[in-house]
């Protein structure tokens, strides 16, 4: 069942027919394909290219096909080359020869470019909504657990932060992701419909009308570019990859924090699994799967970049390979965002263990150095003094705040009784611009 064949003497081989067909995956575009056809038919009527009664028959047929697909009456299957062929041939079977006028002034090249842009817009809006839900949960859980905890560099305890502030760092990452996606939406918001195969059409079609009807800002400026452009797919998968990178970083920390070695958090049962042999195990499989799925999205990005490399203008069949990477990347990032939101919104925070870890890591050493600076010592000298204090504490298995004033004075006469108040963890986190961390 093909939309072409008049210039061929021999039938396409079954092997080639199966190899060439994209229906198994581009069937996802049925809604966009039909909506694009509806807009195209309305424009053809407005421009007196087809008659009003022909428009009504075609529109009725398209709406019926859409309804039958949505209700599961019409299955998207069979020996069709693609979703465009499926819709058009079913339309002709339903309403007769008038259905053959649907494709007037249009090519599958601008048709598929339109379908993919419409689908990309819808998909991006879905991802943005998932990002917003995750960001809301990060804020909510952070506000509910504004506890002091260790901050890390090199995975070594470094300085005091709060659990809330740590989560807000991820909020900032996802906020940037949202902005990147919104920017991508603005760039792709041009309609390729009317570009034809590559050189427009001899019909006096109204591209402005269809662009507006389909929710685009404007039609594309160049027909060749309109059917050849897949930059937006590359850009979106790239942005999905950055989202996945952020999710993998958060996943890694959740996995570490939930381990027996940290015990900072407990991941809810709803997002954990067990072991088939070890009865005691509770595994953070949700976070681990998110961490692992980054590879497939990175792979999708490399796939589409490779497809588009060195392609001459205009459309080439290689571009059929743009869909599966995009579909996979979009589905993966949405599922990962939803699972991460579930993990965050249901986790439990162990306040006591957070504080125990704070006290074990000399996390007030920088504040102790700042104390000496405030007393008149140069920072580099203060840095050396406190480094020596830390060595002394390690030998004694003690914390800085547990040393007596006499012990501290062995390292500098500048130490006074007020050192203890200055390096208190809860006090120090509210000094200077540290107040911006919002500990209360």
Curated annotation (Swiss-Prot):
Reaction(s) catalysed (UniProt annotation): 2-(N(omega)-L-arginino)succinate = fumarate + L-arginine
Task: Write out the pathway annotation from the protein's UniProt entry.
Answer: Amino-acid biosynthesis; L-arginine biosynthesis; L-arginine from L-ornithine and carbamoyl phosphate: step 3/3
Q: In the Enzyme Commission scheme, what number(s) does this protein have? A: 4.3.2.1
For this entry, list what GO says about its biological process.
Answer: arginine biosynthetic process via ornithine; L-arginine biosynthetic process
Keywords (A to Z) from UniProt: Amino-acid biosynthesis, Arginine biosynthesis, Cytoplasm, Lyase
Q: What is the top-level taxon of the source organism? A: Bacteria
Q: Does the keyword Cytoplasm apply?
A: yes
The cross-references to PROSITE patterns, in alphabetical order and at most eight, read: FUMARATE_LYASES (PS00163)
Which locations, inside or outside the cell, does it occupy? Cytoplasm
Cellular component, GO, one term = cytosol
Where does it primarily localize?
A: cytoplasm
SUPFAM superfamilies according to UniProt:
L-aspartase-like
UniProt GO molecular function: argininosuccinate lyase activity
Top EC class, one word: lyase
Q: Does the keyword Lyase apply?
A: yes
Q: What would be one Pfam family of this protein?
A: ASL_C2
Family affiliation: Belongs to the lyase 1 family. Argininosuccinate lyase subfamily.
- The molecule here is called Argininosuccinate lyase
**Origin species:** Clostridium botulinum (strain Kyoto / Type A2)
Q: Which gene encodes it?
A: argH
């Amino acid at each position: 069942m093909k939309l072409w064949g008049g210039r061929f003497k021999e039938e396409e081989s079954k092997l080639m027919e199966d190899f060439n067909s994209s229906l198994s995956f581009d069937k996802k575009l049925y809604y966009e394909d039909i909506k694009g056809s509806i807009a195209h038919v309305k424009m053809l009527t407005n421009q007196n290219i087809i008659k009003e009664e022909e428009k009504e028959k075609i529109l009725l047929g398209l709406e019926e096909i859409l309804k039958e697909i949505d209700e599961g009456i019409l299955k998207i299957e069979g020996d069709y080359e693609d979703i465009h062929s499926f819709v058009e041939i079913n339309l002709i079977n339903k309403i007769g020869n008038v259905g053959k006028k649907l494709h007037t002034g249009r090519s599958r090249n601008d048709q598929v470019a339109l379908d993919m842009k419409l689908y990309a817009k819808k998909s991006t809006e879905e991802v943005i909504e998932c990002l917003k839900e995750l960001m809301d949960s990060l804020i909510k859980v952070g506000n509910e657990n504004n506890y002091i905890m260790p901050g890390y560099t090199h995975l070594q305890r470094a300085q005091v932060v709060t659990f809330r502030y740590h989560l807000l760092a991820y909020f900032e990452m996802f906020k940037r992701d949202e902005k990147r996606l919104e920017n991508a939406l603005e760039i792709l918001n041009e309609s390729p419909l009317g570009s034809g195969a590559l050189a427009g059409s001899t019909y006096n079609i109204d591209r402005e009308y269809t662009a507006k009807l389909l929710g685009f800002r404007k039609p594309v400026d160049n027909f060749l570019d309109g059917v050849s452009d897949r930059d937006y797919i590359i850009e979106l998968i790239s942005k999905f990859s950055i989202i996945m990178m952020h999710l993998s970083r958060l996943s890694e920390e959740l996995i570490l924090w939930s381990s027996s070695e940290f015990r900072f958090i407990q991941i809810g049962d709803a997002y954990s699994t067990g072991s088939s042999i070890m009865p005691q195990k509770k595994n953070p499989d949700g976070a681990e799967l998110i961490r692992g799925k980054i590879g497939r999205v990175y792979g999708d990005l490399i796939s589409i970049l490779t497809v588009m490399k060195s392609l001459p203008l205009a459309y080439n069949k290689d571009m059929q390979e743009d869909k599966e990477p995009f579909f996979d990347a979009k589905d993966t990032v949405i599922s990962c965002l939803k699972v991460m939101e579930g993990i965050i919104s249901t986790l439990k925070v162990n306040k006591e263990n957070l504080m125990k870890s704070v006290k074990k890591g000399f996390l007030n050493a920088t504040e102790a150095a700042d104390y000496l600076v405030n007393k008149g010592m140069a920072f580099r000298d203060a840095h050396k003094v406190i480094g020596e204090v830390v060595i002394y504490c390690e030998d004694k298995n003690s914390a800085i705040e547990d040393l007596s004033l006499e012990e501290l004075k062995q390292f500098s006469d500048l130490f006074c009784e007020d050192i203890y108040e200055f390096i208190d963890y809860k006090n120090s986190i509210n000094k200077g611009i540290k107040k911006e961390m919002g500990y209360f």
